Swiss-Prot record:
Assigned keywords, A-Z: Endoplasmic reticulum, Isomerase, Lipid metabolism, Membrane, Mitochondrion, Multifunctional enzyme, NAD, NADP, Oxidoreductase, Steroid metabolism, Steroidogenesis, Transmembrane, Transmembrane helix
Protein name per UniProt: 3 beta-hydroxysteroid dehydrogenase/Delta 5-->4-isomerase type 1
Known role: A bifunctional enzyme responsible for the oxidation and isomerization of 3beta-hydroxy-Delta(5)-steroid precursors to 3-oxo-Delta(4)-steroids, an essential step in steroid hormone biosynthesis. Specifically catalyzes the conversion of pregnenolone to progesterone, 17alpha-hydroxypregnenolone to 17alpha-hydroxyprogesterone, dehydroepiandrosterone (DHEA) to 4-androstenedione, and androstenediol to testosterone. Additionally, catalyzes the interconversion between 3beta-hydroxy and 3-oxo-5alpha-androstane steroids controlling the bioavalability of the active forms.
PANTHER family named in the record: BIFUNCTIONAL POLYMYXIN RESISTANCE PROTEIN ARNA, SHORT CHAIN DEHYDROGENASE_REDUCTASE FAMILY 42E, MEMBER 2
Location within or outside the cell: Endoplasmic reticulum membrane; Mitochondrion membrane
Main location: endoplasmic reticulum
InterPro entries (alphabetical): 3Beta_OHSteriod_DH/Estase, Lipid_A_modif_metabolic_enz, NAD(P)-bd_dom_sf
Entry binding sites for NADP(+): 10-15, 155, 159
Transmembrane segments: 288-308
Membrane topology recorded in Swiss-Prot or TrEMBL: Single-pass membrane protein
Cellular component aspect of the GO annotation: cilium; cytoplasm; endoplasmic reticulum; endoplasmic reticulum membrane; intercellular bridge; intracellular membrane-bounded organelle; microtubule cytoskeleton; mitochondrial inner membrane
Amino acid sequence: MTGWSCLVTGAGGFLGQRIIRLLVKEKELKEIRVLDKAFGPELREEFSKLQNKTKLTVLEGDILDEPFLKRACQDVSVIIHTACIIDVFGVTHRESIMNVNVKGTQLLLEACVQASVPVFIYTSSIEVAGPNSYKEIIQNGHEEEPLENTWPAPYPHSKKLAEKAVLAANGWNLKNGGTLYTCALRPMYIYGEGSRFLSASINEALNNNGILSSVGKFSTVNPVYVGNVAWAHILALRALQDPKKAPSIRGQFYYISDDTPHQSYDNLNYTLSKEFGLRLDSRWSFPLSLMYWIGFLLEIVSFLLRPIYTYRPPFNRHIVTLSNSVFTFSYKKAQRDLAYKPLYSWEEAKQKTVEWVGSLVDRHKETLKSKTQ
């Protein structure tokens, strides 16, 4: 496609930034529109440095602002929709999550139709598939298995509804008489430089004598490096613009993993930080079944206090299940249809992430140093 343009929502986020860095290398791409609620000065400067033959246009606005979305979509060839509220701990109000993640996606699809944008790629989540029970074991799962998250928690529920809306929109008629083609990518838990979940775990450990909190010692998962997830998006947009490949991809979803070893969340955090003296918590912990029922009791307490006080439990049944299940998936379908092969090996991904973790450790040391002066 000659002289095409791409809109990336959530472009200021952990994944969005990595997609932009790869997008600027695409041939015949004349413009990238980077959309988010707000961009800090450092990120604006980074985007300006990325500009070469490809124009980068920064768009600050609300995903629920219909006129703004219609303007953003004008003369765009491809949309990569990563923008969403990620919240597994119940900090954000349910209505806000549903509005941004579901209504925002629906409004963007409608703007696509009005602006006649033919390609729409949605960043979904592994949580769309589950896990629904820590007793359920899924190893090397695939797209043909009828897996669907049944938790009422707002984040997985909203991502499930949004993905369904995106895939149902495949084949819609566009205003110019063309057709809208869509697909969705379901990445595993994403790690890498800039991960706020990994950053929170490391900083918490640094403030706790180097002891990493146990978040999922009973789990077996296959986390995916952020650079490989970004690469999968590039391959998806290429494939949906390829007349030979596109028919088998339209309306489909794909699990995105890589060659990161299958391990627990706790072991991943330890592997990425042990070089700096951080260590796993060796203290005795409650059995998983007991943790599940304690989570249930905390939910009841939260519900009973709701009329007079907002109590957010440290964990609930959903978090216990999410963090302690055997839940791994294959990327064979993405390999077959998208020609997906991880851009970064496990060793490369580990090295880059460990270097970034080292910068967090150095920053912590500098903070302590300044406090003692």
